[in-house]
């Protein structure tokens, strides 16, 4: 924690992040790590439940994004499964996560998906973007007007993160070391 308003485990500007290949590690999502019935219950990375992944927006050549994997949608026949939840073979996803939005509505709000119909299988992610991290990066999954989400360099909304768009999983961090690069660019 070296930035005002930062928190333990948070990735701050200037931190050097070690990246583990996603081929070496299965991504554990926030919903899996917070579900008491899931084998990954209690797992944390960078101060919060679930893994932080590095991905390319829509598989493009934009600067990669480093955000937490909130949940994964998996194709199942004609519907969708959400590992770490009771949602199996559903057509749309409605889910309120135990994910406090401290900087949104005075902290009296939970991250919410309302009747979301996935475009394809992949991860939904969230980071320290607008609304204090209480916005899904993928605009189609945001409900109640939390925000516009992320867009790629062509202006297209970011879609659920496919496995082959994932560059890696954030491993350990070394505070301040990356500041040298920030100062020289």
For each predicted feature, which ranges?
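Extended, hydrophilic extramembrane loops/domains of integral membrane proteins
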Residues: 112-184
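Short amphipathic alpha-helical surface micro-motifs
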Residues: 36, 47-50, 103-108, 141-153
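Feature for secretory/organellar precursors and membrane-associated catalytic proteins
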Residues: 1-103
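Low-complexity, serine/threonine/proline-enriched polar segments
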Residues: 93-124
């Amino acid at each position: 924690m070296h930035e005002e308003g930062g928190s333990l485990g948070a990735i701050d500007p200037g931190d050097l992040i070690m990246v583990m290949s996603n081929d070496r590690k299965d991504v554990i999502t926030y919903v899996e790590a917070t579900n008491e019935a899931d084998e990954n219950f209690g797992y944390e990375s960078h101060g919060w439940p679930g893994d932080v992944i590095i991905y390319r927006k829509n598989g493009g050549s934009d600067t990669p994004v480093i955000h937490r994997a909130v949940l994964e949608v998996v194709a199942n026949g004609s519907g969708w499964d959400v590992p770490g939840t009771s949602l199996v073979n559903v057509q749309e996803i409605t889910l309120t996560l135990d994910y406090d939005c401290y900087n949104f509505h005075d902290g009296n709000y939970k991250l919410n998906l309302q009747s979301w119909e996935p475009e394809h299988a992949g991860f939904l992610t969230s980071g320290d973007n607008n609304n204090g991290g209480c916005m899904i990066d993928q605009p189609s999954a945001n409900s109640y007007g939390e925000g516009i989400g992320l867009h790629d360099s062509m202006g297209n909304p970011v879609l659920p993160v496919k496995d082959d768009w994932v560059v890696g999983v954030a491993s350990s961090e070394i505070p301040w070391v990356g500041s040298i690069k920030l100062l020289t660019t």
